[in-house]
Amino acid sequence: AAELLQRIEAPEIAMSLLEEDDYITRGFAAQSLAKHENLHPKFAEDEHHSVRIVAAENSIDKDLISSLMEDKHSSVRRMAISSAAKNKLKLSSKTLEAGLLSSDPALRSLVASLAVTSGGDVLEKACKDINPKVRKSIAETLRLEVTEVDERIDLIASINPEIILRWLRSRYDPKSSALRWNMIENTSLNSRIRSKLIEQMDGRNDVDRQRLAIISEDSSILVKIAADNLSSSLDE
């Protein structure tokens, strides 16, 4: 009967099978009833993770998803975080911070994408994560969701400028250009990042030549070479 539910809709049968002792049967029944939002809390309380994961995958209730993000089983936690990200749920800072404490970088990278939306202290914590998966997730979410310089971009630039280096590629609006120059002129920044930011202006005809002339005298060889190359290309 359980396998039959995969092929036909039979909610009455599925409801009765939810009470079975066999977790495989309950899992099939839960999958069959996945669209019934009123049953998600029941699935979430099931003793077996294969039933709880159905709630994690299908619920858009932020409180239920928040509780499932702290589930004892990693696959349920991952699914809950994935659902929260997919449905752009506005979760509390406390819930997101708990997610960032996970030992699993794949989970932390999902939480980090939500942190971009929320900003503030949670985003600051996510940006301090040294795992490349987490950093890539932040960069990708920024690329897709953030179209202009705002307080989140300024915050990330101060903590993890490498991420903003990627975001600034192909962005030449006034705010982006101002941020790029501020980072180039910040001598406490990594020379490689500063030189890459200069290279981003190659081919542009709106480069501030006065600022470029000053940067050409920089103490960093990398920055000086990048500035000289840009200056030469402008003169061609």
Where are these regions (language model features)?
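Structural detector for internal amphipathic alpha-helices that build alpha-solenoid repeat scaffolds
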Residues: 1-8, 16, 23-35, 42, ...
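Active-site acidic Asp-centered loop
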Residues: 46, 71, 129
